[in-house]
């Protein structure tokens, strides 16, 4: 567990693309288990008033697990779709506290 990282990912859809953003994320998040990573939490909002459309909390076994996921050819093959539907992404490390 010493190398484990937890991330918060906030995503904003391009105009009219909130459903397409969710569909894209459904596809790419399904790849996480292949890279020793998982979704801890995923919430979807309206994106109103400048808020993100989707917020995810992800756990990866290590930085190399995250790097493997980000470089997965199944994911990178969808980069045009990602660029079309996602206007902005913020990804940063967090500590989960209950």
Predicted regions and their residues:
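Short S/T/G/P-rich N-terminal loop/turn motif that feeds into the first structured element of a domain
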Residues: 1-54, 59-71, 92-98
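C-terminal structural segments of small proteins and small subunits
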Residues: 66, 71-85, 89
């Amino acid at each position: 567990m010493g190398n484990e990282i937890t991330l918060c990912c906030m995503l904003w859809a391009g105009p009219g693309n909130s459903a397409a953003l969710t569909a894209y994320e459904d596809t790419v998040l399904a790849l996480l288990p292949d890279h020793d990573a998982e979704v801890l939490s995923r919430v979807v909002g309206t994106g109103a008033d400048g808020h993100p459309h989707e917020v995810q909390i992800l756990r990866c076994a290590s930085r190399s697990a995250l790097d493997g996921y980000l470089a997965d050819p199944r994911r990178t093959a969808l980069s045009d779709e990602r660029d079309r539907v996602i206007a902005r992404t913020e990804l940063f490390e967090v500590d989960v506290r209950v």
